Amino acid sequence: MDTVEPINLLGLDAKALTDLVGQWGGKPFRARQLQRWVHQRSVDSFDAMTDLARDFRAQLSERAIIEALPVNIEQRSSDGTRKWLFDVGQGNAIETVFIPEDDRGTLCISSQAGCVVNCRFCSTGHQGFNRNLRTSEIIGQLWWAKRVLEADIGSARLANAGAEDTRVISNVVMMGMGEPLLNYDQVLPALRLMLDDNGYGLSRRRVTVSTSGVVPMMDRLAQDCPVALAVSLHAPNDALRDDLVPLNKKYPLKELLAACERYLAHAPRDFITFEYCMLDGINDTDQHAKELIQLARQVRCKLNLIPFNPFPASGLKRSAAPRVKVFAQRLMDAGIITTVRKTRGDDIDAACGQLAGEVKDRTRITERNAASRSIPIRQVHA
């Protein structure tokens, strides 16, 4: 007799869970109760769900599970940043990072085991690509981190918090391993769970999707679930961006900027964040700043300058701090809202661009990288 694989409830958004409970003879309010137990109270035992009928709990125990990915390693940085390495099977692992600050707690989650975009300055891209994560594996990172952090630091924080500061995790950014918009069908239900009042109850302004510029899926996200958007820009012209972000060859800057403008009509914020990794001698000259100013004036945006975090075999160097300061000042003098990201967790390789996990590459990206990364990047101006 064949056994039916239990359904992992972490992978179901409100509609999917309501439909499932309905198939089992339950009412919609039962699905809402169940969703609150799973995502708000971080419960993984159906026996603990005391306001559910006993026979329904028994049914759940037979047919469903609440199961996050196994954690292989947890690391803590001297600055309070925490990183988890989750086992996704078959020799692959992904990384998730929690960044505590005085006014917020940000969780950076992954959407793929590896990444096919292969940005030149990103450690994840250097590892290659294995597979997309399932919704349960994406939301499971949030579920696990919330559960662990509330147990570890939640009580102390909540005791001293005001009414508006009761969350350990107040912001979620999809800036970990992978390109979220190339795993859209699994990412979308995860986003909806983050926003759902019976799920994690985050506002659209506090959930950010970062993309390297998958234009058609940016348009879909604007219609389906318009959260805050960050775009990995990293170059002010097509010639240089073709080298740094190969996806630019498919969706060049003109198309990308037009998609950003369309997204703004639906976005929860009145600007797009452009991320710009500062690379010594590559994209950090005064001429690059001049070109970037011209680009930034075409769409309402904020520039986030990111110090490059080196990794083996990158062949790249971080821009010196004085150069970053001058570059940022030129942008601000031109009226462009500009911030310089503070590096967090670099002592545990948890900073921007350092997440690598463990990836069994199915795309031969690592082989191609061995050849291509020996070729110097041209310092290109428009």
Swiss-Prot record:
Q: Name one GO cellular component term.
A: cytoplasm
Report the co-factor binding details: Binds 1 [4Fe-4S] cluster. The cluster is coordinated with 3 cysteines and an exchangeable S-adenosyl-L-methionine.
Q: Name one GO molecular function term.
A: rRNA (adenine(2503)-C2-)-methyltransferase activity
State the Gene Ontology BP annotations. rRNA base methylation; tRNA methylation
Domain Radical SAM core: from-to ranges: 101-347
Q: What EC number(s) does its UniProt record assign?
A: 2.1.1.192
InterPro entries noted in UniProt? Aldolase_TIM, Methyltransferase_A, RlmN_N, RNA_MTrfase_RlmN, rRNA_lsu_MTrfase_RlmN/Cfr, rSAM
Detail which positions bind S-adenosyl-L-methionine: 178-179, 210, 232-234, 309
Q: Which UniProt keywords apply?
A: 4Fe-4S, Cytoplasm, Disulfide bond, Iron, Iron-sulfur, Metal-binding, Methyltransferase, rRNA processing, S-adenosyl-L-methionine, Transferase, tRNA processing
Top-level taxon: Bacteria
Where does this polypeptide localize? Cytoplasm
The catalytic activity, as recorded, is: adenosine(2503) in 23S rRNA + 2 reduced [2Fe-2S]-[ferredoxin] + 2 S-adenosyl-L-methionine = 2-methyladenosine(2503) in 23S rRNA + 5'-deoxyadenosine + L-methionine + 2 oxidized [2Fe-2S]-[ferredoxin] + S-adenosyl-L-homocysteine; adenosine(37) in tRNA + 2 reduced [2Fe-2S]-[ferredoxin] + 2 S-adenosyl-L-methionine = 2-methyladenosine(37) in tRNA + 5'-deoxyadenosine + L-methionine + 2 oxidized [2Fe-2S]-[ferredoxin] + S-adenosyl-L-homocysteine
- Co-factor requirement: [4Fe-4S] cluster
Spell out the Pfam families in the cross-references.
Answer: Radical_SAM, RlmN_N
More details:
Reaction proceeds by a ping-pong mechanism involving intermediate methylation of a conserved cysteine residue.
What family does the entry list? Belongs to the radical SAM superfamily. RlmN family.
Protein known as: Dual-specificity RNA methyltransferase RlmN
Which species is this record about?
A: Bordetella avium (strain 197N)
Taxonomic lineage: Bacteria, Pseudomonadati, Pseudomonadota, Betaproteobacteria, Burkholderiales
Q: Which gene encodes it?
A: rlmN
